[in-house]
Amino acid sequence: MSESIKSLELLAEQFGKLGGVGKRTAMRLAFSVVDMTEAEAERFAEAILEAKRNIHCCPVCQNLTDLEVCPICSDTTRDRSTICVVADTRSLMAIEKVCEYGGVYHVLHGMLSPMQNITPDDIKLRELIERVASEDIREVIIATNPTTEGEATAMYISRLLKPAGIKVTRIANGIPVGGELEFADAHTLACAFDGRKEY
């Protein structure tokens, strides 16, 4: 007969609420915390509380930051006429790692999803529209994932902005570097051909 440890289960349950953490991983994380010294556990708990208290949305681009305005919006060398729209801060960080993009961003904090009842009012679309209307924006690059939700979000943004004369583009997607054509699905191949560029 297995004996449960209520405090451990409660801790694992809280870890299980984190995105992408299953029951087994949650339990492993709970055991890791139990194995910490009391001082380490206090620092861990304080780091969580500190992040929760100090991290907020940048008032300009909605990126997560612990400053008044995020470092990207504060950077005067950035091209402010181009906005790259992303679903979340993780996507922004992935683009920044490439170091190829020199414009600014707008973080939606989600994507449209009728199946999950996520409407334009549930994400930071109003802030994007207001920003485009009040700033000298020449191009909006939509960099949402190539999923049904990402495509729906991209199409919705395009329909809102194009009538205002804003150039709206979508990042290309297709065959990854090192990928083999025979393993690509029809949609990926079609996107690769549609997103082709002169060589």
Model-derived features with residue positions:
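Long C-terminal interaction/binding lobes of large macromolecular proteins
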Residues: 129-141, 145-199
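Short glycine-/acidic-enriched loop or helix-start segments at secondary-structure transitions
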Residues: 70, 95, 152-154
